[in-house]
């Protein structure tokens, strides 16, 4: 990795093209799961308890998501350390705290099926994580071990098979 400052902007170069591309793509899938933690916390509990439940669940999902991303990137020829950089953890953070993927995840966490949530709340909005899930989901579900990627399998089945979200830790 090479870091240089250009004007007031920081430019980071990484030679791990596979790792950068894979991390930047699959973080969209995982950010839907992290967003689901907000939907899962919408209950009859007081707001203070809901927000703490949401944040603790989100933190747990981020931790497990990074572990799965490292294994996924390594499996497909990238370097595991790339996941901890801007294209992985950095991009996951940005997408998970307020992006379109996170918003779709919130609806999935509330119990909506993907197709219903898309049609009702996000009809003309691009959801990169869902589009990627539809494109790669069938191959991933066939080729990888669900014990190694329980979060990814859960969201892929939710999107590709239009099932209710189940998070199998």
Where are these regions (language model features)?
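Short secondary-structure boundary/capping segments
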Residues: 2, 21-22
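NAD(P)-dependent Rossmann-like dehydrogenase/reductase catalytic/cofactor-binding core
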Residues: 14-16, 21, 27, 32-42, ...
């Amino acid at each position: 990795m090479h870091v240089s400052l250009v004007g007031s902007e920081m430019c980071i170069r990484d030679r791990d093209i596979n790792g950068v591309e894979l991390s930047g793509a699959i973080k969209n899938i995982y950010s839907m799961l992290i967003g689901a933690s907000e939907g899962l916390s919408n209950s009859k509990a007081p707001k203070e308890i809901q927000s703490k439940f949401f944040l603790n669940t989100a933190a747990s999902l981020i931790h497990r998501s990074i572990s799965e991303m490292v294994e996924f990137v390594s499996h497909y020829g990238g370097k595991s350390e790339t996941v901890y950089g801007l294209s992985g953890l950095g991009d996951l953070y940005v997408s998970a705290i307020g992006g379109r993927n996170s918003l779709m995840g919130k609806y999935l966490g509330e119990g909506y099926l993907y197709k219903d949530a898309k049609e009702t709340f996000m009809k003309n909005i691009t959801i990169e994580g869902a589009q990627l899930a539809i494109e790669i989901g069938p191959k991933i579900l066939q080729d990888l071990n669900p014990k190694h990627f329980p979060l990814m399998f859960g969201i892929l089945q939710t999107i590709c098979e239009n099932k209710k979200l189940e998070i199998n830790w």
